[in-house]
Amino acid sequence: MSFDRSKTPTWRPGYRFQYEPAQKGHVLLYPEGMIKLNESAALIGGLIDGERDVAAIIAELDKQFPGVPELGDDIEQFMEVARAQHWITLD
């Protein structure tokens, strides 16, 4: 089954993506705690706005990082993990 890039990711209620100076990086805050995101996840997370679909997020990052092999696949993987961890919904 292939990933549907026309789906739009949205942070779940109670989850907030932000830069945290104390962590020197981006984090995902939620009622039970916090997850520190690596640089790649932070770049993707910064584009999750409930407006862009996955294809648009891939296109935007491809503009910023042209020629990166398997960029789309990596973003799909992030979306799958984020959905499995209940950080986002894909509608």
Curated annotation (Swiss-Prot):
Keyword Cell wall biogenesis/degradation: no
Top-level taxon of origin: Bacteria
Any GO MF annotation of the entry: quinone binding
InterPro entries: PQQD (IPR008792), PqqD_bac (IPR022479), PqqD_sf (IPR041881)
UniProt KW keywords: PQQ biosynthesis
Pathway: Cofactor biosynthesis; pyrroloquinoline quinone biosynthesis
Pfam families recorded: PqqD
GO biological process, any: pyrroloquinoline quinone biosynthetic process
Nucleus in keyword set: no
Biological role: Functions as a PqqA binding protein and presents PqqA to PqqE, in the pyrroloquinoline quinone (PQQ) biosynthetic pathway.
The family this protein is said to belong to: Belongs to the PqqD family.
Subunit composition and interactions: Monomer. Interacts with PqqE.
Name of protein: PqqA binding protein
Organism: Pseudomonas fluorescens (strain Pf0-1)
Gene: pqqD
